[in-house]
């Protein structure tokens, strides 16, 4: 007998091996029809998977996140099937699931056009309606290579040829189409009902710029039509809020080909940057951090000691001078350890919190660069806390509270926490990693927050806590991190004198709240659709005169506001007041002040708030109080 334990704790017994589909059928016809896959002892499998021993089983449907992933993975194969039906000469390569969808890369003799995409999507719908069964076959490697070579699929044959000879090869067949895949997949193509092809882009084979360029077709797929419609609506909103367009429209920044991945900040954009930096500097000072500055370029020997040269060199900009190799820093941490090491530290000095608005450079692939969101040169609100093991929980708890408070001030109320665990390529022993991961778990428990664990996503030197903020249109952005590092202090010889006069290694906590300033400012711009709150807006107030006779008074109002610390300017151009109001409204200025003869004579201003809200006429002092309240409350 085989005993199957279901998620509710109930057990079902079967006389012999049983498939996931058969278990679902034994529970009910409705569940059997809805089943897309199964989870056997935590492993995602096809509904045809045969269970041959006692196991825990969850039936996966389209109501589960895993179910939606299976739909998307299967839709990627449906896309490849349709392309092969319409364009037999096209060669298939890879087709993974990505956030909110999937893509598939093809080699074809000509570029796919928008008309091709429409035809492919139509063919996908036809194939889905045929409800062809999707079956898994197990092949040995050499036979699978021969199969794909006989089909003229050189890319697929190359992938399979790189797999160890003794490893089973899983192939999935639907109708006339067969593809390499680990699976799982839906039981039949009829389960795929809601999908849309989005765009075509270029992609190098195996991600290597030295290889041939392929065509990547992106698509999205969902369990329900209304989910897809909501997603497409969100994309429309995102298009309107694109920070690259806002940067140009609002004259904040630009990028150009001569400096790929580097930002040219214009005066107004730099005002926003400075507002954010000064705010963060104040928060860090209040939290007991000391601000430092470390060199941009350091010798290879330091990066070798830190492990960056071995583990991160492909992402570093390197140079040579006077027969010495140097690297531009991709991270600030080794420099901060040098400051810690400069002089003998005592346990009484700990925790030591060193903060730096550190400019870093990373050699990101040119194809991955994207406005402010993915750059090569960036500044981090970086800090490193050197502490004892006993201080980890208290320091992590304090950081967590600071991070949540900062996000709240910037208008982000929905924050999710994730714990990234050890990657395959890492420094340090398993024992060190066990200790580091459990240390962060203890800290999170002390903070009273819920978190999700992400195996394999940690940095090479330690596990990390990630803070994901949700913006106004529902997108999630990973910003802050807290990383526990037991490796770097040892590599770089950091130590302190303990209470018993012995030498000990400090624990090092790497932490950032905003992450990259550039990326965070991009997120802010898109979250607010460019209409930044008054405390962050580059121009908080514009004072406009109706006629030349009020110009002197308008200037005096601006000077008064500037003395109060506000970012104010005058528009004294000989233009119609309606033209001025419209122009500055499009620039999303929080407050527009209009002065005519009546306002001048009464020492007042006519106030318009953003969104064409007429607040009427008020004394300048009353407006100052209003703006002070907005800035202080971060409204």
UniProtKB/Swiss-Prot annotation:
GO terms for biological process: threonyl-tRNA aminoacylation. Its main location: cytoplasm. Its EC number is 6.1.1.3. Belongs to the class-II aminoacyl-tRNA synthetase family. Homodimer. HAMAP family: Thr_tRNA_synth (MF_00184). This is Threonine--tRNA ligase.
